[in-house]
Amino acid sequence: MKYVHFDSLFRVINWLDTDQFDIALPDSVLPVTDAQWRYRDRECWVNPIAGKLVTTPPPGEFYRLSGDKWVYDASAFATALEQVKLQVVQSIKQYRDELTADYIVIDGNHFHSDANSRIQQMTLAKMGQAGAVPPGLMWQTKNNGLIELTNAIAAQFEVVTIEHDMRLFAVAQAHIAAVAALDDIAAVELYDWSQGWQP
């Protein structure tokens, strides 16, 4: 006897010939004729209720077999779309977090904005506002090397950091809203969320 072994989506995953081999048959099998056996090199599905082999492939990705007809599965599409959106949103949030800890810009200088730098900058902001930054204090930037840290620069740390965080949050939310509005998986995957982050 010849059989096809199929999965939960009724897709044939194995062709079994018990005449040639001593095989313990799995649960989900359907006997096939010699004529049907000719299709063993093609992708096939089964209609177990009618005992039929389906050789016509689905017309698209989100179709399921109902009897021996392919029907569009809107629920499967919606689930897949939601999963892709979640992945893109996660990437947007991760990028936002990386930029948050990257740098802030004051007078064209890029100052580190990781957690340790922010702690130092809070104190420096108070010193700058009070005019208490020592003259000649040199500070490392990400783009211009060592620069003299003046009271005018130091006084801006707090406000610029808050503006930086608020801007990145707003940009992330705008990208997340744009992704949420898309109703096509390819459009979600191709959406370019890399724009508009840093000044």
Describe each region flagged by the PLM.
Residues 1-2, 7-39, 47-199:
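A preference for well-ordered globular domain cores
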